Structure formats: structure tokens, C-alpha cells
């Protein structure tokens, strides 16, 4: 009996769970159905695939007015002297003559009054600099000459070396050499005399001395 009661309870619980699960599944949102990838066409290809592409295109694509998106360039090849430049943001076209870059720059510089004024100012400055430098140069030269002329007067005079000093030094050198030569000759004479006699007392220089 207990087993039958427990099995009946389990069955009732399972039925309740199934019912709850079915309720939640029914409440789910319906999924959006998307067609095959071949049915979708890129926006950039509109009008390039012919009338068949427009026929198969959806309604929101056909409602799009493409007027003004592209400009017809039929008259571009006729006038070679003008080039249409489309700006990236404003979409405005400006007609410019077909000229080389150097001539365009020259024309723009001639037409601008600010550049003319700046060129005049630079010319004036250069002329003023040239005149000021030319006027300063002679002034600087005269100032340098005055400084050179006043330079020796401010310093004490240095006495010139006399030639007599040089002569005296030469004479002393000669006398010193002669005195040395005489001393050497005396020593040589004494040594020779001693070798001959064997004593110093017999020399006439030491005859009057009592020390020996």
C-alpha cells in the first residue's frame, strides 16, 4: 500500500511539472523568421542590378528616393579648362581653371592684399637694416681707432732692454771661461811638478810658508 501511494504521488508531481513546463514554453516569444541569405541585397547594389533587382527589393528600399545622391557627369569631358572639386563635408562644387600649381600659387599671392602688405613690410625692414648696418660700420671703425690711440697712453712705459746688458753678460761668460782655463793650467802644472820632484815644498809658491 505504501508503494502504491508513493508511486501515485510521484506521478502527480510529474504531471504538475509537465504542465508548468508547457505553460512556460507557450509564453515564449515567437522567433523572427529570416529568409535565406540570397534574398538580402546590399544597399550599394540598388539600381546596378537592373530592373529585376528593384522588383524583388522590399518596399522600404523602393521608397528610398535616390534623387540628388549622384550627380551626372555628362558635361565634364566637354570643358577641359574647368574641374569640379567636390568638398568632403559641404558637397559644394568650385570651378577652378586647369592651371599648373606654380601659376595657381602666384595668382593667389597676387590677389591677396595681406600678402602684398607683408611683402612691402619685409622689403622696408630689409632696407632699414641695410642702411642701419652701413651707418654703424664707420662709427664702429672710428671708435676702434680712438681706443687704439688711447691704449698706450693709459699704460706705463716699459723700459727697453739695453744692449749693454747683453754685452756685459757675454763678457762675464768669456772671463769666466778664461779663469777656468787658467785654473786648469795651474793644476796641471802642479801635478807635473810633483811628479818630477816628489814634494810640494820645493815649489816656489810654497817656499815662504811655514805651515808645512
UniProtKB/Swiss-Prot annotation:
One GO cellular component term: apical plasma membrane
Subunit note: Interacts with ARAC11/ROP1.
CDD domains in alphabetical order: CRIB
Organism of origin: Arabidopsis thaliana (Mouse-ear cress)
Main location (coarse class): membrane
PROSITE patterns: CRIB
PANTHER family per the UniProt record, alphabetical: CRIB DOMAIN-CONTAINING PROTEIN RIC6-RELATED, CRIB DOMAIN-CONTAINING PROTEIN RIC8
Keywords: Cell membrane, Growth regulation, Membrane
Protein name: CRIB domain-containing protein RIC6
Keyword Cell membrane included in the entry's annotation: yes
Compartment annotation: Cell membrane
Domain CRIB: start-end pairs: 34-47
Region spans: Disordered: 51-212
Protein's gene: RIC6
Composition bias, Polar residues: 53-65, 192-202
Segments traversing the membrane: none
Misc. remarks from the entry: Over-expression of RIC6 in tobacco germinating pollen reduces pollen tube elongation.
Residue ranges with Basic and acidic residues bias: 106-121
Reported tissue expression: Expressed in flowers and pollen.
